[in-house]
């Protein structure tokens, strides 16, 4: 162990520990901007400078290892003065129009400047503005970029897509799309992890909230909104609601208060997804020679985009079942429209998702089974929160309301879609029922849960062994695809979520700088699942009615027309 003193406190830590890590063990949080543990430890911002007794120069706490006998001052006049100067220099190259920034109030730079008492910038302003396609689902504002390199590192080290890179040199150094290509022509999957790991407002999703106001004001439109499973785990954070108030019913009430005509649950569509995908898996198992192996899930649009752009060889392996968002949209403009005597074009189908890639998915050519876009507008969880704030709605004051029918009732299986391993578990619950003729034990498939990069398990269905694999994060997915193509591994059924931890850790979720919360939010979904009276998709009476009255059976001709896609043209927009 190495012994040192930090701000007068004796500290004993293992060799190799940095000063920043050592300080944290005794509750001393050293200010920083660029630091991401294990991902971005490059001291780019120079905000974490500290003074060491006996040394003339300050050092960066995030990269300097501890030494025996060091006496460290994290906030001495010298360290504080240099830290202040460094932040002032960053601000001189940053668009400080905080009032019009989506990260205002949740910006690490803004907080740091306030903490340091910086109210004027003594240096000449030098803010670089480069053009960007404002219609693209992911927006980059070069005026706000502080060159912390977090986006570069999260994309390189975690997702391994290498979309961002350093451009130019010297004073003109900036971050932009790598390879001298546009973002549209890059391999970007729109996972949004660069957004959630940006400490400022340099990266954000396209703002589609104004479209909501337009459609709510249109008397000729019936507004139908669906809410994804993961959204219910995080929407209430911004309003500091305790768990007993942050309920599904209160979430529904807020949407009704805004003025949406019908509020439905994407978990219902997830149940339908399972009916189709589980049937598809069983068909593959019955005729293995007719299909490509393994069969991949296809509910994550970031994953589907990734396969199309980087590993097209595996496109035939994707389940043809659409994502719950798109299945809901197709049913809203066909089944629901028929029940209500409406034409598809009279319905505006809106989704609230934890995901940026859903915006791209909704615009694809292949997602127009009704003759119009099946989903017209997609909001992220963050946009939903901004919409509530703009409407001055206090959710705590609203009485709970149920989801509307017939697209509102769901099972626990639909809920767990939002967590890594959830789609796999939900599909296996139904596949087991079909093969064995009885319900699986409650904990039969819970071992597929978790946020590990790759989790391999074997289950017995109908006397045969099913080898499954759940993958979290595109970096892990790429490694898996390489091994599959080389013949190093073999699986029968593979679930992939583009975002580490699944949709609960999605690129459209609320941002908590420096925190990874997928585990915590995923457990919320599993808690909801365990308390549901129905936990298997095939037991949803509304789904049973859908098949009896409209679709006939899973994989029927009508189901194939409305609920399936070959995914071949997933990169083509409307």
What are these regions (language model features)?
Residues 6-9, 53-54:
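Short strand-turn-strand beta-turns centered on an Asx-Gly dipeptide
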Residues 14, 136, 146, 189, ...:
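Residue-level recognition of alpha-helix initiation/capping sites
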């Amino acid at each position: 162990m190495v012994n040192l003193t930090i701000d007068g406190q004796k500290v004993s830590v293992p060799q190799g520990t940095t000063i920043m890590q050592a300080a944290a063990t005794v509750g001393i949080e050293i200010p920083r901007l660029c630091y991401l543990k294990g991902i971005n430890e490059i001291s780019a911002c120079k905000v974490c400078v500290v003074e060491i007794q006996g040394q003339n120069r300050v050092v960066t706490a995030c990269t300097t290892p501890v030494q025996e006998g060091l006496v460290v001052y994290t906030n001495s006049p010298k360290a504080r003065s240099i830290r202040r100067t460094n932040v002032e220099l960053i601000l001189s190259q940053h668009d400080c129009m905080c009032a019009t920034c989506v990260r205002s109030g949740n910006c690490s730079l803004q907080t740091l400047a306030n903490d340091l008492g910086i109210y004027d910038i003594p240096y000449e302003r030098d803010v670089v503005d480069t053009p960007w396609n404002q219609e693209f689902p992911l927006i980059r504002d070069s005026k706000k970029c502080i060159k912390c390199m977090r986006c570069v590192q999260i994309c390189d080290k975690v997702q391994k897509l290498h979309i961002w890179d350093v451009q130019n040199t010297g004073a003109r150094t900036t971050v932009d799309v790598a390879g001298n290509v546009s973002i549209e022509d890059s391999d970007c999957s729109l996972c949004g992890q660069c957004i959630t790991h940006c400490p400022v407002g340099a990266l954000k999703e396209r703002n589609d909230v104004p479209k909501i106001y337009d459609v709510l004001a249109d008397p000729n439109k019936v507004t139908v909104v669906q809410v994804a499973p993961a959204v219910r785990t995080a929407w209430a954070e911004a309003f500091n609601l305790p768990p007993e108030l942050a309920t599904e019913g209160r979430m529904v009430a807020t949407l009704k208060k805004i003025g949406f005509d019908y509020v439905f649950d994407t978990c219902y569509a997830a149940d339908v997804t399972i009916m189709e995908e589980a049937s598809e898996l069983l068909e593959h198992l019955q005729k293995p020679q007719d299909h490509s192996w393994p069969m991949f899930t296809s509910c994550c649009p970031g994953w589907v985009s990734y396969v199309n752009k980087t590993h097209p060889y595996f496109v035939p392996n994707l389940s043809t079942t659409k994502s719950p968002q798109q299945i809901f949209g197709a049913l809203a403009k066909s089944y629901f429209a028929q029940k209500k005597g409406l034409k598809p074009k009279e319905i505006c189908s809106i989704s609230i998702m934890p995901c940026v890639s859903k915006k791209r998915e909704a615009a694809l050519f292949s997602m127009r089974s009704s003759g119009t876009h099946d989903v017209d507008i997609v909001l992220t969880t963050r946009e939903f929160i901004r919409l509530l704030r703009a409407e001055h709605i206090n959710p705590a004051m609203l009485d709970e309301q149920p989801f509307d029918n017939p697209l509102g009732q769901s099972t626990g299986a639909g809920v767990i879609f939002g967590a890594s391993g959830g789609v796999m578990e939900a599909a296996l619950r139904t596949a087991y029922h079909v093969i064995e003729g009885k319900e699986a034990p409650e904990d039969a498939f819970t071992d597929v849960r978790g946020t590990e990069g790759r989790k391999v398990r074997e289950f017995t269905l109908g006397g045969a062994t099913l080898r499954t694999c759940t993958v979290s994060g595109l970096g892990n997915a790429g490694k898996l695809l390489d091994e599959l193509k080389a013949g190093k591994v073999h699986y029968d059924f593979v679930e992939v979520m583009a975002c580490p931890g699944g949709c609960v850790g999605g690129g459209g979720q609320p941002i908590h700088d420096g925190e990874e919360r997928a585990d915590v939010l995923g457990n919320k979904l599993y808690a909801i699942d365990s308390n549901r009276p129905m936990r298997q998709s095939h037991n949803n009476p509304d789904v049973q009615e859908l098949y009896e009255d409209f679709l006939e059976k899973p994989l029927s001709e009508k189901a194939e027309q409305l609920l399936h896609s070959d995914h071949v043209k997933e990169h083509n927009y409307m």
